[in-house]
Amino acid sequence: MTNTVLEWMVEDAQRLAECRHDHPFAVLGPQPQEDGTWVLRAWMPEAEGVTLLLGDQEMGMSTPHHPWIFEASVAHDPGCAYRLRVHRGGITHEQHDPWAFRQDWMGEMDRHLFAEGNHHHIWRRMGAHHCEREGIPGVMFCLWAPHARSVSVIGDLNSWDGRHHPMQQRLGGIWELFVPGLAEGQLYKYEIRTQEGHCYQKADPYGFQHEVRPDTSSVVSHLDGFHWTDTDWIQKRDSSNPLDQPIAVYEMHLGSWIHAAADEPFIEADGTPRAPVPAADLKPGARLLTYPELADRLIPYVKERGFTHIELMPITEHPFDGSWGYQVTGWYAPTSRYGTPDEFRAFVDRCHAEGIGVIIDWVPGHFPRDSHGLAFFDGCHLYEHADPRIGEHKEWGTLIFNYSRNEVRNFLVANLVFWFDQFHIDGIRVDAVASMLYRDYLRPDGEWLPNEHGGRENTEAVQFLQQANHVLFQHFPGALSIAEESTTWPMVTQPTDIGGLGFNLKWNMGWMHDMLDYFELDPWFRQFHQNNITFSIWYTYTENFMLALSHDEVVHGKSNLLHKMPGDDWQKYANTRALLAYMWTHPGKKTIFMGMEFGQRAEWNVWGDLQWDLLNYEPHQGVQRMVDDLNGLYKSEPALWRDDFDQYGFQWIDCNDNRHSVISFMRRESTSGTWLVVVANFTPQSHSHYRVGVPLAGYYEEIFNTDASKYGGSNLGNMGGKPTEEWGIHGYENSLDLCLPPLSLMVFKHDPKKSLNPVQE
């Protein structure tokens, strides 16, 4: 060996020992020699001795260059078949050599698609994958960190010592290493050394499972092997238009719906108790439910209530309960607070078996600064903008994704596909879209940068959202993509090919604010604010709107829905019932937050659970019964949902009676031509002879009344229905002479089979 080669070996050994080597394959593993022989070099820090096992041969390996580089000469290329017997710390074990597996994991096409931002299944390459290479089982680790000086895998496999498993840098800033013999369930992180010599320990951005908070390591976890039973559901979903279907969503937070006692642990399939995950310091005796327990309790509850979908506040991994899940660190993993990825799959599968769709909140707008997360990932601003004027949400303390970087955009778009592909979810709600669309969002003058045209629109975020929605519907045509967009940005729910953002639903924030402002008023003053309850119809067909009363309206001192209402307790319940009924009969799909379905009194608390004891009291039972019946009515009457986004589906009868705070309208369905008449009285004053015009003579059955006694009302009504009279009003020749209960909403349906003879009262 020449002095030059010896100097190289000494330098390489020093770089390996100091975790500074970016190409260990150049030194380690089988190395061809000029004379046709091969030298095998094994990197074994702190080993006392290593024996090469090649076929039937055993030969001791020497350390001519460094005490941790063991080598032996062989006549032919040994491939990957050889093993090493390692003696370290008084313990002997055998293993395959990680640096014998030299073939690229990321192929040329993978790298090309990733670099241009179009690898829709990049998670199949990135991250930790249990697989076989050359017939040898193990785990392939793959990471994107283009600015790193070196990267090592650390974890249970090497006592968290970054010297043991340095990764190989490939083209495009990709780092790879196959660790043979590594089993699932192992904890790991990446130790990243920057060009300046700083060392960071990062969780895997593409990790499929992570430790339970407060621990932050990634967990080697498989993707395959779960047996789905929802093929029919998925086929039906993707062959139909969700906008033509009834959608009533139960928004919820899994960790605060209900808790279990910490001394009653979840029992695994093998009979062993699972370590409880504490609910909160404020409830030391409580634990979080597991995904299987939630499936047993939540799914029957939601089905009994009649909701069509569950919307889960973020179930991606997050370190801080107080973020409600909106500060994500594990984008490709369901949170381990409630169990394993396969247990979450089973939860979704059971939802589908019971006819319930699953929507998750997706947060591509920002991410937290936690040291184990994406922030300053490889010593540079890799995932975020370097300039804080476009890279930080100062008010939230989070960082903003750099949507102009192809690989970052690919990370997010593929993540969207991942949740539909791997977990069979049915929809997403994108949080805080307005914060993405505007560069000056929550920023004073001088603390934001204009776009290339001098405007405040974030054109990069617009292009990202368009790409994400285009790719989503390309792969999953029956999906729901819901925007929480609080401004008047145009064409949010229009297709991307005509310049829209590509969502198919948008939360109607204007409707929500107008309704709550109206219902919080003393009923006497409502006559001066009639516009609040009628204005939404003027713009409701500009987008595909979803009406939402969400978690944001029952926190931070806003009180819960029931306590927003004026008056005594009876009026509070009646107002709540009237608001929900108006919501269900107004055009647009529906979402309410957990607890509203039975009149929760307290604000939502992420560290608590719902006030289930309230269901011991009749008024709360009444609200719950009404919501059950509302959902039943809603799903059974296509006039309430078929033409939500067509002007044919709604027609005012009278929206101008502000003196009485009464409105009346029709919901119509184009396929069958059926219609419903809706009449609402938003004051505590009942009316015994209130006339409402209708388009067709006949008998109108009262099919719903929020004032029914079973809901906690005064039981005023119209004896099941009324015939019309030839009394012209509201532009119609026939009308109904109705009794309007206080603070109520009623629904009538024309019944051509019933007699037109007057009903005796």
UniProtKB/Swiss-Prot annotation:
GO molecular function: 1,4-alpha-glucan branching enzyme activity; cation binding; hydrolase activity, hydrolyzing O-glycosyl compounds
Keywords: Carbohydrate metabolism, Glycogen biosynthesis, Glycogen metabolism, Glycosyltransferase, Transferase
Key word Thylakoid present: no
Coiled-coil regions listed in the entry: none
GO biological process, any: glycogen biosynthetic process
Residues of the active site: 431, 484
One term under GO cellular component: cytosol
Pathway note: Glycan biosynthesis; glycogen biosynthesis
Enzyme Commission numbers on file: 2.4.1.18
Enzymatic reactions: Transfers a segment of a (1->4)-alpha-D-glucan chain to a primary hydroxy group in a similar glucan chain
NCBIfam families documented for this protein: branching_enzym, PRK05402.1, PRK12313.1
Function of the molecule: Catalyzes the formation of the alpha-1,6-glucosidic linkages in glycogen by scission of a 1,4-alpha-linked oligosaccharide from growing alpha-1,4-glucan chains and the subsequent attachment of the oligosaccharide to the alpha-1,6 position.
Family per record: Belongs to the glycosyl hydrolase 13 family. GlgB subfamily.
Subunit structure: Monomer.
Name of the protein in its database record: 1,4-alpha-glucan branching enzyme GlgB
Lineage of the organism: Bacteria, Bacillati, Cyanobacteriota, Cyanophyceae, Synechococcales
Annotated gene: glgB
